[in-house]
C-alpha cells in the first residue's frame, strides 16, 4: 500500500482497495436501511402501532445478542472479503423473499431475523478491514468517511422508502434493494484477498465441542481484553449507547410523524431523518477534516451533552405546542422548521460521539481482536437494547412520543454528568 501523509478524504479514496470497500459499504448499507424502513412504513401504515414497529426492529436486533459474539470469533479466522461477498448475495435472495410475504407481519419478522443473522457476520468483517487497507495516520479520516456513509445511508434509505413505495410499489422496491446487494458484492470482490486464513467449512468440520470451547475461550479473551483497557471499554460503551438510542428514535419515527407532526408517515424522512443525516454528514466531515486535531475526549463530551439537551428541547417544544394559548407560537409554520434545525444539530452531536469512539476502538484493539470487539459491540446493542427498544414503543403508545423523547434526553444528560465527574476524578 502506498504510504501517504495527506490526511484527507481524497487521500483515502485514492487507495483503490479502500475505495472498493467503501463503494461496497454504500450499496450494502443503502440496501439494508431501505429494506428496514420500507418494512417499518408498511407495518405502521397497516397497524398504526409503535409497538409493532418496535418488534420489527427487535427482529433485526435480537440476532446480534444470540450470534454477535460467535460471529465475531468465527470471522476472526476467515477471509473477511469472502464473508462480505457471501453475506451480500444471500441477503439479496432473502429480500426477494419479501416480495411474496411482505403482507404477513410474522413472516416478515422471520425473514428479517435471518437477514439480521447474516449481518452479524458482515459487521465484524467489514470494519476491521479498514486498518489493513489504510495507513495509521489516515485512520480517523477513513472512519469519518465510513461514518458519513453509514448514517447517510440510514437517512437515504428512509428517504427513498416512502417515494419508492408511492411510485413503484412494494414489489419493485424489493427488486431494487436486491440489486443493490448484488452490486455491493461485486465491489467487495475487487478488494484483495487475505492470506493464510481458514475457510468456513474447515472451521465447521472441526469437532463441535472443540469449536464451542474455542468460541468460549475467545469470548473470554475478548472480554478480558476490553476490561483491561479503560479507553477501549469506554469507546465500546459509547458506541453501544449511541446505536441503541438511534434505534429507539428510529422505531418512534413513524409515530412521531403521524401523531406529533401530523403529517403523512411517508414524509417522515423530510422532517426527521433528513435533517439528522445532514447533521451527521456535516459533523463527520468536520471531524475528519478539522476536528480530529482536537481532543477526542472533548469531542465526545460535547456530543453527549448536546444530544441530551437537544432531545429535551424537542420534547418541550412539542409540549408547548399543545398548551392552550401557545399554539400560535408553535404552529406548524414555525414548529416544523425549528424541529428540522434541532434534528440537524442532533445529527452533528452524534458524529462528535461516533467518529472519535470508533477511532479509539480501532486504535486500541490490535490484530484479530478487532473482529471480536466489533462482534461484542453488535451483541451488546442487541442484548442491552432489547428492553429499551420494546419499552420505547410500548411507552410511546401509552404516554406519548414526546415524553419518551424527553426521558431519553434526560438519561443522556445524566450520563454526561456522571462521565464528566469520573473523568475529572
For the regions a language model picked out, list residue spans one by one.
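Juxtamembrane intracellular "pre-TM" segments in multi-pass secondary transporters
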Residues: 2-19, 194-237, 260
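Short loop-to-helix capping motifs
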Residues: 15-16, 49, 104, 169, ...
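Substrate-agnostic recognition of the 12-TM MFS/MFS-like secondary transporter fold
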Residues: 19-36, 59-73, 79-92, 107-166, ...
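Short amphipathic helix-loop junctions that connect adjacent transmembrane helices
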Residues: 37-50, 251-266
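Helix-breaking motifs and short loop linkers at transmembrane-helix boundaries and internal kinks
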Residues: 47, 79, 101-103, 317-318
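C-terminal transmembrane bundle of multi-pass solute transporters/carriers
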Residues: 56, 66-70, 81-83, 87, ...
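Hydrophobic alpha-helical transmembrane segments
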Residues: 106-109, 116, 141-205, 274, ...
Amino acid at each position: 500500500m502506498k504510504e501517504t501523509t495527506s490526511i484527507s478524504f481524497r487521500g483515502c479514496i485514492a487507495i483503490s482497495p479502500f475505495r472498493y470497500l467503501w463503494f461496497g459499504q454504500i450499496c450494502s448499507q443503502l440496501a439494508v436501511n431501505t429494506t428496514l424502513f420500507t418494512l417499518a412504513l408498511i407495518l405502521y401504515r397497516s397497524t398504526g402501532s409503535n409497538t409493532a414497529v418496535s418488534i420489527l426492529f427487535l427482529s433485526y436486533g435480537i440476532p446480534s445478542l444470540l450470534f454477535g459474539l460467535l460471529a465475531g470469533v468465527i470471522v476472526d479466522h476467515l477471509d473477511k472479503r469472502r464473508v462480505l461477498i457471501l453475506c451480500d448475495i444471500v441477503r439479496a435472495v432473502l429480500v426477494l423473499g419479501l416480495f411474496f410475504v411482505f403482507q404477513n407481519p410474522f413472516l416478515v419478522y422471520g425473514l428479517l431475523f435471518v437477514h439480521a443473522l447474516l449481518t452479524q457476520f458482515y459487521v465484524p468483517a467489514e470494519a476491521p478491514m479498514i486498518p489493513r487497507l489504510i495507513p495509521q495516520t489516515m485512520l480517523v479520516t477513513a472512519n469519518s468517511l465510513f461514518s458519513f456513509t453509514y448514517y447517510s445511508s440510514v437517512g437515504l434509505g428512509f428517504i427513498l422508502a416512502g417515494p419508492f413505495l408511492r411510485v413503484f410499489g412494494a414489489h419493485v422496491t424489493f427488486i431494487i434493494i436486491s440489486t443493490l446487494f448484488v452490486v455491493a458484492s461485486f465491489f467487495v470482490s475487487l478488494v484483495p484477498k487475505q492470506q493464510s486464513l481458514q475457510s468456513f467449512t474447515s472451521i465447521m468440520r472441526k469437532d463441535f465441542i472443540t469449536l464451542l470451547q474455542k468460541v468460549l475461550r475467545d469470548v473470554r479473551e475478548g472480554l478480558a481484553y476490553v476490561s483491561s483497557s479503560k479507553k477501549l471499554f469506554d469507546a465500546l460503551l459509547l458506541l453501544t449507547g449511541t446505536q441503541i438510542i438511534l434505534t429507539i428514535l428510529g422505531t418512534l419515527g413513524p409515530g412521531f410523524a403521524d401523531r406529533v407532526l401530523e403529517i403523512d408517515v411517508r414524509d417522515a424522512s423530510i422532517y426527521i431523518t433528513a435533517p439528522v443525516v445532514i447533521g451527521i454528514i456535516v459533523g463527520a466531515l468536520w471531524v475528519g477534516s478539522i476536528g480530529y486535531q482536537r481532543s477526542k475526549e472533548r469531542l465526545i463530551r460535547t456530543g453527549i451533552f448536546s444530544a441530551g439537551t437537544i432531545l429535551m428541547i424537542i420534547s418541550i417544544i412539542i409540549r408547548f405546542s399543545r398548551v392552550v394559548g401557545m399554539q400560535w407560537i408553535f404552529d406548524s409554520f414555525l414548529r416544523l422548521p425549528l424541529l428540522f434545525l434541532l434534528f440537524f444539530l442532533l445529527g452533528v452531536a452524534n458524529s462528535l460521539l461516533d467518529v472519535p469512539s470508533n477511532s479509539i476502538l480501532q486504535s486500541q484493539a490490535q490484530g484479530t481482536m478487532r473482529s471480536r470487539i466489533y462482534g461484542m459491540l453488535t451483541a451488546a446493542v442487541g442484548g442491552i437494547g432489547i428492553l429499551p427498544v420494546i419499552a420505547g414503543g410500548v411507552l410511546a403508545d401509552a404516554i406519548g412520543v414526546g415524553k419518551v423523547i424527553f426521558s431519553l434526553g434526560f438519561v443522556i444528560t445524566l450520563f454526561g454528568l456522571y462521565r464528566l465527574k469520573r473523568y475529572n476524578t
